[in-house]
C-alpha cells in the first residue's frame, strides 16, 4: 500500500466588501488529503482518499481546499483496472472525468483558473461514477465517463455523461471534451470545451482553454455561459515552477466578464 499526503495553505484576504478601517483581516486555513493506493494484480489500482480541513471558509474557498469542518472524511473510493486494451474505473464520490486528458500544463492554487476553462464539460462531483479510456499508442486517446447523484441511470436520477478526445505530441497537445448533464427530470445542460498547450524550448509553456455551455430550460437571453483561460508556466524557477494566468468562469451571456 502506498500513501501520499498533500496540502496545507494560508491566505490573506479582505473579507468585507466595504472600504473602511475594519475591512481588512488575516485569514488562515488548513487542508490536507491522504491518498491510499494498493494493487492486487500490478495492473489495477484501488484508491481511497481521506480529507480534512477548514479551507471552505469565506475568503479562502477559492483555493479549493477541503472544508469538512475539521472532520476526517472518506472523500472518495475508486477502482481502476484493465479490460482488453482499455482502462476502466468505477467509483463512489468520484469524478466521471477521472480518465480524461485535458490539454493543459498550467497548475495553480486558484479553483477558477486551475480548471483551464474545462469547468463543466469535464464532469465532476458525482456520487457514483464510471468511465473508460483507450490509448491508441500514437498520441491519440479517447475516453468516456458517467456519473449520477441518485439511482444509476434511471428516470428519477440526475445523470451526467461526457466524451473526451485528445492528441499529445512531443511538445504540444489538444483536447476536446463534451458533456450532457441533467439538471432536472426534464432539462439538461450541454457543455463543450477545447484546450491546447504548447511548450517551446527555452520559453514558458502556453496553455489556453475555452468552454461554452447551453443552459437547458433558461430564457433565450440567458441560456448560454462561457469560460475562458490563458496561462504561462515556467518549469524551472528556483526549486519549483512559476505560473501566471488570466481567465473567467461560468459567465452568463449578457453579464460582465469577471477576470481573475
Roles of regions detected by a PLM:
Residues 1-5, 10-12:
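Short, small-residue-biased leader/transition segments that mark boundaries at the very start
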Residues 57-58, 98-100, 152-153, 184-186, ...:
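Extracytoplasmic/secreted cell-surface and envelope-processing proteins
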Residues 156-259:
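Detector for outer-membrane/organellar transmembrane beta-barrel domains
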Residues 13-20:
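Short glycine/proline- and aromatic-enriched beta-strand/turn motifs that initiate or cap beta-hairpins
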Residues 20-148, 166-168, 234-235, 239-243, ...:
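Outer membrane beta-barrel
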Amino acid at each position: 500500500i502506498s500513501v501520499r499526503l498533500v496540502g496545507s495553505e494560508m491566505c490573506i484576504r479582505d473579507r468585507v466588501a466595504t472600504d473602511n478601517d475594519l475591512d481588512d483581516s488575516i485569514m488562515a486555513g488548513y487542508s490536507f488529503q491522504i491518498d491510499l493506493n494498493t494493487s492486487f494484480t500490478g495492473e489495477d489500482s484501488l484508491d481511497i482518499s481521506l480529507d480534512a480541513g477548514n479551507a471552505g471558509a469565506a475568503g479562502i474557498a477559492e483555493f479549493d481546499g477541503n472544508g469538512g469542518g475539521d472532520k476526517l472524511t472518506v472523500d472518495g473510493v475508486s477502482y481502476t483496472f484493465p479490460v482488453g486494451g482499455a482502462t476502466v474505473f468505477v467509483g463512489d464520490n468520484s469524478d466521471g472525468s477521472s480518465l480524461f486528458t485535458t490539454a493543459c500544463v498550467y497548475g495553480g492554487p486558484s479553483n477558477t483558473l486551475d480548471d483551464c476553462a474545462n469547468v463543466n464539460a469535464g464532469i465532476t462531483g458525482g456520487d457514483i461514477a464510471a468511465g473508460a479510456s483507450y490509448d491508441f499508442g500514437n498520441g491519440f486517446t479517447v475516453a468516456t465517463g458517467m456519473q449520477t447523484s441518485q439511482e444509476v441511470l434511471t428516470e428519477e436520477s440526475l445523470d451526467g455523461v461526457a466524451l473526451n478526445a485528445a492528441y499529445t505530441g512531443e511538445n504540444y497537445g489538444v483536447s476536446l471534451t463534451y458533456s450532457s448533464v441533467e439538471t432536472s427530470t426534464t432539462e439538461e445542460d450541454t457543455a463543450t470545451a477545447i484546450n491546447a498547450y504548447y511548450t517551446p524550448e527555452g520559453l514558458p509553456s502556453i496553455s489556453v482553454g475555452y468552454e461554452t455551455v447551453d443552459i437547458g430550460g433558461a430564457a433565450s437571453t440567458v441560456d448560454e455561459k462561457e469560460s475562458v483561460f490563458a496561462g504561462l508556466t515556467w518549469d524551472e524557477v528556483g526549486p519549483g515552477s512559476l505560473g501566471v494566468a488570466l481567465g473567467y468562469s461560468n459567465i452568463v451571456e449578457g453579464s460582465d466578464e469577471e477576470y481573475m
